[in-house]
Amino acid sequence: MKLDAPVMQEEELVERIRVLLPSITEHAAQAEQERKPVDSVMKSLEDAGVYKFFVPKRYGGYEFGLETFMDIGVMLGESCLSTAWVTTFCMEHNWLLSLYNREAQDDIFGKQPYIIAPGALAPKGTATPVDGGYRISGRWEWATGVMHADWVMVGALTPTEDPKKPDLCMYLIPRDEVNVIDTWHVAGMVGTGSNDIEVEDVFVPGHRKQSIVDMRDGSSPGALFHDSPIYKMPMMPVLGLTAAAPAVGGARQAVALFRERLQERSVYGTADKQSQRAMAQARLGHAQVAVETAEVALKNIARTVVHWGESGKPCPEIERAHLRLKIAHVVREARDVVRDVVEASGSHAHFLTSPLQRTLRDMHTLSAHTVFDLDVGGELYGRLLLGLPANAPV
């Protein structure tokens, strides 16, 4: 059977990825050294078919579901957080393209089976209307996936009939028309290679523009074009879950490493192993339950998002804010699990050869992502509960 045969089953793709996990784990330190995912690892994931996960069946994709996507994100995060982050983002960005108008999808999916693209959607660009499209200029941070990309997605404020109310739109630009600026010198998630990107007066045809506002509640052009409910899910919760799944995997990895560490580490001044001490046993038990609870919460949130896609109704703003805050709490819990087990693992956990210290740095960096900001998310949801207008996009 061909690798890209449309009869691929979700379980088969999951198993293909599972086979790659030892290699992904083995190359995690190299990804950090190179400040980007390792080329051979990314090629193996691409060959396994991961980027066709969300591509519509009409274009030869798999059109798989969100819950299995969560399983994959957790699995990958348990092996290498940086590689997981890039892979899940680039998988999900094929879902974003599937929300575009039909002409854009025919243009791109009609010529290639999937895209590998960062999504730098902050409104850091300008869009100037011209015949047939727009001239785009700007510079964007956080271009996760750009080191292996063939396209980029960027956000730009776009003029409307009301000059005081520009529209925030997403534009698709070929990678070879983009400059990559080496800015990714960070404490954690070093292996993502999420450098800045810049474009200068690049022409983008009109059909490769999509209003982000029209994608937020699940009523995008793609939602009307495709029959599957996965393209009717609200955008921001899907983006949040995309980033949260690797975090839960990172916490699972940390707990597993902590368990191994307890069986090796001696209590200073005694012949006892740390695993024989009640306090260490209790910490392990609490950490295991905490990460299991976070994973259950992650899957429950995903089911709620799927429900909104299946309902055929736009997801209300207050529900999107609620989901955003719940996702942020999952990530905070996962981060705290890692922090707690590293604290109990002794000084050896902080050697650069220890994967625990890398996971700790990665989790602190990952949890600083704007979608996981508990203060902003809490205020936003609280305002809506009180009948006040939202003060942040959701």
Question: Residue spans of the language-model regions?
Answer:
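Basic/polar N-terminal segments that are highly enriched at the extreme N-terminus
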Residues: M1-E15, V19, A392-V394
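Short, contiguous, pocket-lining structural segments
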Residues: Q9-E12, R16, Q33-P37, M189-G191, ...
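C-terminal helix-coil-helix/basic helical segment that borders enzyme active sites and/or dimer interfaces
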Residues: T25, A29-E32, T293-H329, R339-H350
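Glycine-rich flavin
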Residues: P37-D47, K52-A149, K164
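DPxDG-like acidic metal-binding loop motif
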Residues: R139-V178, D182-T183
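Glycine-rich beta->alpha junctions and the first turn(s) of the following alpha-helix
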Residues: S194-V291
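Generic structural signal for well-ordered, non-transmembrane alpha-helical segments
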Residues: G249, G285-E292, A328-R335, R361-H364, ...
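Glycine-rich phosphate/cofactor-binding loops in nucleotide/flavin-utilizing enzymes
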Residues: S345-V394
